[in-house]
């Protein structure tokens, strides 16, 4: 989450990185290449024609090795296509806008194509009760900033994925609480 403050400190705009992260690009490349490699190995064992550069799968028996390689290759290719689509659609990406001049807060995220492709949440700054920091350590750590509203709703403001560093999380939460002039909870 990156923060840019502009217009005389009356507007805070935070970009949220969605699925267009380096790790997602790397996993999409690896899974797609592996899936296509397995699929070509299975097809090569059936046709007895080498379709790969790095190996000779024509020596494999089609039953059962070739069929298994084709099946896993098909699954890997489909999963690779899914990963590429999530990167192209930038799932989870968006921004948080906090505007003191108009008294409005807008949280925007991108979703899957269709009726709910754009997820928008709007509220007034007067409806904000506090900013909450949620820190859970352990095997599956969670570090998130929430916008707590007076009607008891908690709206997540941080991205999903790799947890933020503690110092960065605390600084961003403190800056946001100071900007909105609300208390900071959870520290």
Swiss-Prot record:
One of its GO terms (biological process) is photosynthesis. It is a multi-pass membrane protein. Disulfide bonds: none annotated. One of its GO terms (cellular component) is photosystem I. Keywords: Membrane, Photosynthesis, Thylakoid, Transmembrane, Transmembrane helix. It is found in: Cellular thylakoid membrane. The keyword Chloroplast does not apply. It holds the Pfam family Ycf4. The chain crosses the membrane at residues 25-45, 69-89. InterPro entries: PSI_Ycf4_assembly. Seems to be required for the assembly of the photosystem I complex. Belongs to the Ycf4 family. This is Photosystem I assembly protein Ycf4.
């Amino acid at each position: 989450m990156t923060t840019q403050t502009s217009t005389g400190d009356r507007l805070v705009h935070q970009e949220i990185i969605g699925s267009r992260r380096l790790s997602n690009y790397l996993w999409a490349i690896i899974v797609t290449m592996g899936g296509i490699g397995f699929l070509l190995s299975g097809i090569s064992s059936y046709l007895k024609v080498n379709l790969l550069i790095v190996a000779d799968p024509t020596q494999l028996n089609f039953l059962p090795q070739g069929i298994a390689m084709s099946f896993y290759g098909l699954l890997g290719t489909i999963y690779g296509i899914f990963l590429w689509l999530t990167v192209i659609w930038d799932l989870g990406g968006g921004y948080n806008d906090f505007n003191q001049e108009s008294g409005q807060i807008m949280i925007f995220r991108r979703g899957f194509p269709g009726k709910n492709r754009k997820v928008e949440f709007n509220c007034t700054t007067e409806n904000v009760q506090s900013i909450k920091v949620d820190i859970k350590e352990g095997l599956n750590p969670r570090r998130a900033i929430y916008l707590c509203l007076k009607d008891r709703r908690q709206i997540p403001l941080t991205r999903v994925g790799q947890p933020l560093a503690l110092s960065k999380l605390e600084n961003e939460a403190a800056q946001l609480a100071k900007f909105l002039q609300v208390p900071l909870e959870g520290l």
